[in-house]
């Protein structure tokens, strides 16, 4: 599984424009092969700062999404002024477990928490 962490600051007065574009792209993501989930978070300290956290089956799915024309157009609009700054991180998920799904829980944690 791949995690894409997109941190960005919206330029003054451009927040709503970004959110509208994100909503449109969300429609494209629905049913996109290899897409798992996405969440968007807004900073409590700086209302212009956001983090978008998406999960993908594999890097090939990320590559295909990166090259979807509507996504490329949205990227260009972001770089042209919607974002005052951004940072993108792409990471391999090492473990994925929850309170109830424990298969990938580290042994030492299982010993303590079950």
Spans of features found by a protein language model:
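Short S/T/G/P-rich N-terminal loop/turn motif that feeds into the first structured element of a domain
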Residues: 1-50, 57-67, 82-114
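Conserved short loop/helix modules at catalytic or binding sites
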Residues: 74, 78
């Amino acid at each position: 599984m791949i995690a894409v962490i997109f941190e960005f600051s919206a330029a003054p007065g451009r927040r709503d424009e970004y959110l509208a574009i994100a909503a449109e792209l969300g429609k494209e993501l629905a049913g996109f092969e290899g897409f798992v989930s996405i969440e968007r978070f807004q900073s409590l300290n700086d209302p212009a700062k956001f983090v978008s956290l998406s999960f993908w089956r594999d890097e090939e799915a990320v590559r295909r999404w990166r090259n979807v024309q509507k996504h490329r157009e949205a990227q260009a609009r972001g770089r042209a002024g919607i974002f005052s700054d951004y940072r993108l991180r792409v990471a391999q998920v090492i473990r994925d477990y929850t309170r109830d799904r424990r298969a990938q829980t580290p042994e030492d944690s299982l010993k303590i928490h079950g």
